[in-house]
């Protein structure tokens, strides 16, 4: 596996590749990231992973400075997973001048759900992803379903800019107790980690209720928020949405996704479960 840090070295490493599959990350990798690399390998060509903690997607008071930088350990995991090339630029390599141009993500996607609590976040995500797409020029890019809103933002950006990239979604990996794997789980204290699976359980309860015929979506979400708040969580949102557009679900909505973001102590956790009328949880 080759590791490069500059744009010139990245281009040289890919100069003879007819196609590639790309997995963008911020590092501090876990088994969920590894599964995305393994999924990328199914699509032919070298697998490229990026490791870059993107300052544009962090707001004031967020965890940019304390986000773990674990490049050596990350490269070991990527090599074991069969990754071919790692692009690990520093900030000056990816942003050689002030990034005054940004991707303008529509408010319906950028200012709802996580965007309502993290202003500018999705513009920062879309901007860095577009830059990385321009540099790597992949035919396939793999993103995790755990960051569901991010996945839809990237898909819509690719569609609207006519980018010749197939966006592939990888399933959310979970610990045995149901907690979705996340680089930020390491922030949790032992007591918080023991409580954290409640978030997934609340989403699963909503999915089960919908599968059982419940259709008062507002009441289901409100009850989950109340239970989480009563257990000491600080809830940003619990919502039931159209899985394709993230618009508020109605009785006619066929594909549903239940999404949540909530804080345990100083750690913000997100999760989601998709709903299908026949099979319940899809991911």
Curated annotation (Swiss-Prot):
Q: Which UniProt keywords apply?
A: ATP-binding, Cytoplasm, Ligase, Nucleotide-binding, Pantothenate biosynthesis
Q: Where in the cell is it found?
A: Cytoplasm
EC number(s) on file = 6.3.2.1
> Binding positions for (R)-pantoate?
57, 150
Give the molecular function GO annotations: ATP binding; pantoate-beta-alanine ligase activity
Q: Which GO terms describe its biological process?
A: pantothenate biosynthetic process
The UniProt record lists the keyword Membrane: no
Supply the Pfam families for this chain: Pantoate_ligase
Pathway given in the UniProt record: Cofactor biosynthesis; (R)-pantothenate biosynthesis; (R)-pantothenate from (R)-pantoate and beta-alanine: step 1/1
A GO cellular component annotation in the UniProt record = cytosol
Question: Where are the catalytic residues?
Answer: 33
Under InterPro entries, the record lists: Pantoate_ligase, Pantoate_ligase_C, Rossmann-like_a/b/a_fold
- For ATP, which residues are the binding ones? 26-33, 144-147, 173, 181-184
- Enzyme class at the top of the EC tree: ligase
Q: Which residues of this UniProt protein bind beta-alanine?
A: 57
Query: What's this protein's family per the entry?
Result: Belongs to the pantothenate synthetase family.
On assembly, the entry states: Homodimer.
List other remarks: The reaction proceeds by a bi uni uni bi ping pong mechanism.
Function, as annotated: Catalyzes the condensation of pantoate with beta-alanine in an ATP-dependent reaction via a pantoyl-adenylate intermediate.
Q: Which HAMAP family match?
A: PanC
Record's protein name: Pantothenate synthetase
> What organism does this protein naturally occur in?
Thiobacillus denitrificans (strain ATCC 25259 / T1)
Q: What is the lineage of its organism?
A: Bacteria, Pseudomonadati, Pseudomonadota, Betaproteobacteria, Nitrosomonadales
């Amino acid at each position: 596996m080759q590791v490069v840090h500059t744009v010139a070295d990245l281009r040289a490493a890919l100069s003879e590749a007819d196609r590639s599959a790309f997995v963008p990350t911020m590092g501090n990798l876990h088994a969920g990231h590894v599964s995305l690399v393994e999924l990328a390998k199914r699509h032919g060509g070298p697998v490229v992973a990026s490791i870059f903690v993107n300052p544009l997607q962090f707001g004031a008071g967020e965890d940019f400075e304390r986000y773990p930088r674990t490049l050596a350990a990350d490269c070991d995991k990527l090599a074991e997973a069969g990754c071919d090339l790692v692009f690990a630029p520093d900030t000056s390599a990816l942003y050689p001048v002030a990034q005054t141009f940004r991707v303008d993500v529509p408010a319906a996607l950028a200012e709802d759900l996580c965007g309502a609590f993290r202003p500018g976040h999705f513009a920062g995500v879309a901007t860095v992803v577009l830059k990385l797409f321009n540099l790597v020029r992949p035919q396939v890019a793999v993103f995790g379903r755990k960051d569901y809103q991010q996945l839809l933002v990237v898909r819509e950006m690719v569609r609207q800019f006519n980018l010749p990239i197939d966006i592939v979604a990888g399933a959310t990996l979970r610990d045995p107790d149901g907690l979705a794997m996340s680089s930020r789980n390491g922030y949790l204290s032992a007591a918080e980690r023991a409580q954290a699976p409640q978030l997934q359980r609340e989403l699963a309860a909503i999915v089960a209720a919908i599968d059982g015929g419940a259709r008062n979506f507002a009441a289901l979400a409100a009850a989950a928020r109340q239970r989480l708040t009563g257990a000491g969580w600080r809830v940003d949102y619990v919502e039931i949405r159209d899985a394709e557009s993230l618009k508020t679900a109605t009785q006619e909505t066929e594909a549903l996704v239940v999404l949540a973001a909530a804080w345990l102590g100083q750690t913000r956790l997100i999760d989601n479960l998709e709903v299908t009328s026949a099979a319940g949880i899809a991911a």
